[in-house]
Amino acid sequence: MNQTAYLGELALDSLRKELNSRPVQRLFLVRGNHSYTACGAEAALSPIFRELGIQVTEFKDFSVNPKMEEAQLGVQQFIDSQSDTILAVGGGSAMDMAKLIRHYAAEQGIKTVLMAMPTTAGTGAEATHFAVVYVEGKKQSIEAEDILPDMAFVYPPFTYQNSADLTACTGFDALAQAFEAYWNRNATEESTQYAMKAISLLLHQLPECVAHPTNPLRDEIAMGAYWAGRAINITKTTAPHAFSYAFTSKCGYPHGHAVALTFPFFAELNLGKPGLCQYFSNYVKQIGLTYNGVGSHDLDAILHEVNLQRLANNPIPVNESHMKNLFLYLTTTL
């Protein structure tokens, strides 16, 4: 699996050059519904499309947690548009939707180029060969080589307008990915290098970026998110992500927030350092990711809806004793 990545201030011009050199004639743009305009992407990209004479078909009719029926609708609209390239511009949802459309179109014999340009700093979806889709309310992770975008364009200015809450949620998702790649059963020398690079760009910068954002801080967070994505593209995620899915699908926690709920507990368990749970409990509270209960749902049942595939990557097998302690942690510490 190979990908060309353009990182930093020159990524926007690199996108223009790639669109021009191919050349792209019909573009299927998978984008966020409101974020595309709010982050400045529309103002930056529309002149490029006009200049190059590219016919653009937009697709934005999908949920924050993309559903299979929405992906199927996207595939049909992509086929009808006769586009030669798919460009995803948005957060994790837009990335996943574009990846799913390319994948399922390929199953019908229609192959195309996929480009990805994130407008949030966190999911790292522009750098992975996984895509998330919800089938009858349950989260599924689709994995295939053609899900990895052919090109990633990480242009930090598109993240400059992200709210504090969005910065916290997506940024912590990236930080968790980096740590989960680091302690992963599948860790390699390459993935560990990516994970450590991501941690160095995220750990101390994220709380400051949430409280007092600056463009240089956001640049670091965007780069950290990309390298975290590169790391989990090799290792996949572990327990914090495995337990997060039901908190999102059943209780409505945003993905990064859901990951943060159990991360402190597993950080201490997996790294074996006393006090680490308390450190990260304070950390997630500092950036506003607190535990707000599970509404009418039963917490024990939520915890037992764990994703066993991701849980299998955890370096320490999770048993019922751990589950009881995790339940106690959530109800007494956060």
PLM regions: where:
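ATP/NTP phosphate-donor binding region
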Residues: 1-85
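Short glycine/serine/threonine-rich phosphate/pyrophosphate-binding segments
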Residues: 12-15, 38-40, 68-69, 93-100, ...
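Acidic, glycine-rich active-site loops and adjacent beta-strand->loop/helix elements
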Residues: 63-65, 93, 101-104, 119-123, ...
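A short, small-residue-rich loop immediately preceding and capping a beta-strand
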Residues: 78-119, 243
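A glycine/threonine-rich phosphate-anchoring loop and its flanking beta-alpha core
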Residues: 104-190, 277-279
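Active-site segments that bind and position negatively charged phosphate/pyrophosphate groups
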Residues: 181, 185-282
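C-terminal charged capping/lid subdomain of soluble metabolic enzymes
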Residues: 276-334
